[in-house]
């Protein structure tokens, strides 16, 4: 009879994986664990990632709803600076023909230069006189 898998701390392999009986287990200790179960779990993970991104999309950094939400936030915030253009994402699952063009936006102020929004992976492009 096989022993059930327990969560074992292995100093060399700190990866925990869920296996038989739903308990955490280290990948290295296969004597007690079911290898097949591990493979199944990994395959499921990979499949889930493929479905999320779609076959031909670039590797997506954010989900579609997240980017839409962020875009709204940025657009709302942009009115404070007097920017009238909304922003478009250059990378991600919902880009349309604007690959590598950067994001066009008006110059706010010569001193301010480019607004840095670190929360999203966006590239800005200066536009207007004075650059």
UniProtKB/Swiss-Prot annotation:
UniProt key word Nucleus: yes
Listed GO CC annotations: mitochondrion; nucleus
One example of a Gene Ontology biological process annotation: meiotic cell cycle
Annotated compartments: Mitochondrion; Nucleus
Keywords recorded for this protein, A-Z: Meiosis, Mitochondrion, Nucleus
Broad class of where this protein is predominantly found: mitochondrion
Lineage top rank: taxon: Eukaryota
Purpose: Has a role in meiosis.
Name by which UniProt lists this protein: Meiotically up-regulated gene 115 protein
Organism from which the protein derives: Schizosaccharomyces pombe (strain 972 / ATCC 24843)
